[in-house]
């Protein structure tokens, strides 16, 4: 039996410092070394979410980390999820289930409520700790937001409760790494500082030996050692949850590929649905709201949305809706997932004002259906057959939506998928026009091959195995971090 290890936690000097990816790396390292690790983040804010086997909803960053651990995702790994519905409020998901919408002012301002949520987070952590060893915790944003510190339940307060050996991750690519590391550590309270075991410099470009003096200077300034300098990399593909990652993605057409325009929505959710297209050499996916780039594409994908009616209203106002309709008439493929699927119908209705103040709006009119937004939230995983009449019976996906879609008039039932329990999903008008509620549907080789039908590319390839590809990436990430981090020091800091 492996020695019990203390929890380890990675916190940041800023958002997008690379905490989630480093957390995933250590999840895989501990798994490789014979431990049974599990990830944990007390509170996450994201529109990229996932439905667990039990039907609970959680952030996708912890799903990626669970995959790196080789275990099934569970809502205990992310007990509190905030899903922004507009610029000022979010849906609160507690232990996998929605408990209502709250403004940021109310969420951070009601102290009793924050205490109750923190208790829920602690209980989830304890349940995980009873089953796994070690727990690999992740903080959120910067740990030095003094105006939020007394109400922060994700960072150093969680580190103290867990008794976690804590490491500060700093993004050197942004510049100002000395000030950010020194300032962050200087602002720690004594009970927080005692947990801080080391600093990891992330996203270093060039020869890391040139930072040796920097290591010494930071140790001298803070009293805390730099235990790793991780290089900037682009050749290891790990799913990223933060919307800031979209800024780094491709946004233009390329010759010789199947060009896929993914429509940028203000409240876009689950853009991770399209990560597989970046890995399959047949496709060139790009995120855009530029009409010229949309009309040049071979395939147009409408993603999910946390505020479908509002996003559709914007598409109508800025001319993108008409561009999609013109592209469809010109023979381009148009495919929608979840909210994008709802947009493809004749009409969307929100009679109870669940999403906002738009009671109804015409859809794109590409599919013979109407959607009514409802209070009940569907969250479930599904095994299904893609195009029920075909042999593609071993597909997997998951649903997260608040809406019921029904066919209009005498439209024939032409589902995209038939689920194991006999239910059907989506509408398949033809190879050029279909939609589905199923997140992760493109991760299935049969669906990718259907997407590629009818196109000639310079790339010839067999079926793309995304699951195997991801496993390779986790191993490559672990190898990179092992090479550039003092693992002996790390292990010594978490051995009881």
Curated annotation (Swiss-Prot):
User: PROSITE patterns of this UniProt entry?
Assistant: GATASE_COBBQ
Q: What residues does the GATase cobBQ-type domain cover?
A: 257-447
Active site per UniProt:
338 (nucleophile), 439
Q: Which domain of life is it from?
A: Bacteria
State the pathway, as annotated in the record.
Cofactor biosynthesis; adenosylcobalamin biosynthesis
Q: What does this protein do?
A: Catalyzes amidations at positions B, D, E, and G on adenosylcobyrinic A,C-diamide. NH(2) groups are provided by glutamine, and one molecule of ATP is hydrogenolyzed for each amidation.
Instruction: Supply the name of the protein.
Output: Cobyric acid synthase
Identify the species of origin. Parabacteroides distasonis (strain ATCC 8503 / DSM 20701 / CIP 104284 / JCM 5825 / NCTC 11152)
Classification from the root reads: Bacteria, Pseudomonadati, Bacteroidota, Bacteroidia, Bacteroidales
